[in-house]
Amino acid sequence: RFTAMALDLLPSLEARIESSADPFDAAVRLAIAGNIIDLGVDGDLSEEEALRAMEEALDIPVAGDVKAFSEAVRPAQSILYLADNAGEIVFDRPLLRTLPGGRIAFAVRGAPVINDAVMRDALAAGIDGLVTVIDNGSDAPGTILEDCGDEFLEAFGGADLIISKGQGNYETLCDEDAPIFFLFKVKCPAVERHSGLPLGTHALLRGRGFS
């Protein structure tokens, strides 16, 4: 349901991005705004509410350094993009299109858990038409490296840049010494405390792998 809704909303949101003064910044904002499509938080979200929320989100400043993120993206030869929820991955497509040529892998969960994206969701969202899709070999919410498969761990260890979507990935990877940028909306008190950002913040945080 959420993937179909997101695909219906995407063209109008892409038009907003293309007409913006800074399409990269707008694509980042949309990717974070997509984080509202979370059955664990907004299970009864209507299409009209989702469109309104994401159009409004394109005007919400991101708490973080978009320029630094852009500068990290530009030279990267191998990028790993960690997916979050099933419907929201549609809204990762504009940001995926801005990434440079080279090896880009989009990682989903290895098996269904809560509303996290799995392989069939990525295929339904058309992600495989843009980049390589892999699964992490795990059914844990978030990304627990000890539970992940060899293909994913090779991609994780070999990536010049890791783009991590959602709170679950932030909570499980924030202490890793890896070149990660975290994109998420602060939705719970635990993440509010850890990140130091207020509830509702649209966050873009650099991981420990960046000096």
Locate the predicted segments by residue.
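Structural motif
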Residues: 78-80, 160-161
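Loop/helix-junction capping segments adjacent to catalytic residues or to phosphate/diphosphate-binding pockets
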Residues: 63, 89-90, 113-116
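Electropositive, gly/pro-rich neighborhoods at or near active sites that engage anionic ligands
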Residues: 1-76
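Histidine-anchored nucleotide/phosphate-binding helix
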Residues: 82-105
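Short amphipathic alpha-helical segments and helix-helix/interface helices
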Residues: 70, 93-97, 119, 152-153, ...
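C-terminal functional extensions of proteins
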Residues: 108-114, 121-211
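Residues at the starts of beta-strands that form the adenosine-phosphate
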Residues: 77-78, 102-105, 179
